[in-house]
Design a protein with these regions (language model features):
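A short, Trp-centered hydrophobic/proline-enriched beta-strand micro-motif
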Residues: 8-24, 62-66
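Helix-adjacent hinge/juxtasegments
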Residues: 63-88
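Charged, gly/pro-rich active-site loop segments
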Residues: 80-148
Length: 204
């Protein structure tokens, strides 16, 4: 998969889920359908009075996820959300309304002035699929950001006993000194971490 492939898939998926954090530190999640992409930047629409807006203004860290049920593909975005500048609000609102005509029934006539547009252009994107064996996982950095890898790594304390390889459900640990986890196929289950007799495996 490429970045472009992931964007196309996110466009094709009917609705995405977006996660925020409220003022009490509790996670909140919502479905968003009214969104468009301009290259790799995603623009989405909501209404000014919603708690969703307050949450994004208080904590701009968000996560977005899309799941393709037919292909068992998941794409996750994590990054910093930004409110579109006042000069650009009308432009992107009109583009979203053109893409999603049903919005005219939700916000008819002048009531659409309550809308506000946000965007996310600097983010990490993770592609994960269960359709391959072993599973496939890819990371991308979009805009002004760096890839934040997750998972497990085998350190130099490894004694090459082979325990990790034996307990890996995807069989993606390669023999060596030290043994090596194939990161693009790692399930992140932690079974190797739990079973290493010398604690040579670290989470990052």
């Amino acid at each position: 998969m490429t970045i472009e492939d992931c964007i196309k898939k996110l466009i094709k998926i009917d609705s995405l889920q977006i996660a925020t954090v409220d003022k009490n530190g509790s996670p909140q999640i919502r479905v968003i359908s009214a969104r468009i992409f301009n290259n790799t930047t995603m623009y989405f629409l909501t209404a000014k009075g919603k708690s969703f807006v307050k949450e994004m203004e208080n904590n701009r860290n968000i996560a977005i996820i899309g799941f393709d049920e037919k292909e068992n593909d998941m794409i996750r975005i994590t990054g910093i959300v930004e409110k579109v500048s006042q000069e650009e609000q009308l432009k992107w609102r009109n583009k979203i309304y053109e893409t999603y005509p049903y919005l005219e029934n939700v916000y008819p006539n002048e009531t659409k002035n309550i809308n506000v547009i946000y965007k996310i252009e600097n983010y990490n994107m993770e592609y994960f699929t269960l359709s391959t064996h072993p599973i496939t996982r890819q990371y991308f950095a979009i805009g002004n950001t760096k890839i934040k890898f997750k998972g497990f790594k085998i350190g130099n304390e490894c004694i090459s006993c082979g325990t990790c390889k034996t307990v890996c459900p995807q069989n993606v640990i390669t023999e060596g000194t030290p043994f090596v986890i194939q990161q693009e196929h790692c399930l992140h289950c932690g079974n190797c971490f739990d079973n290493c007799p010398v604690n040579a495996i670290k989470e990052f």
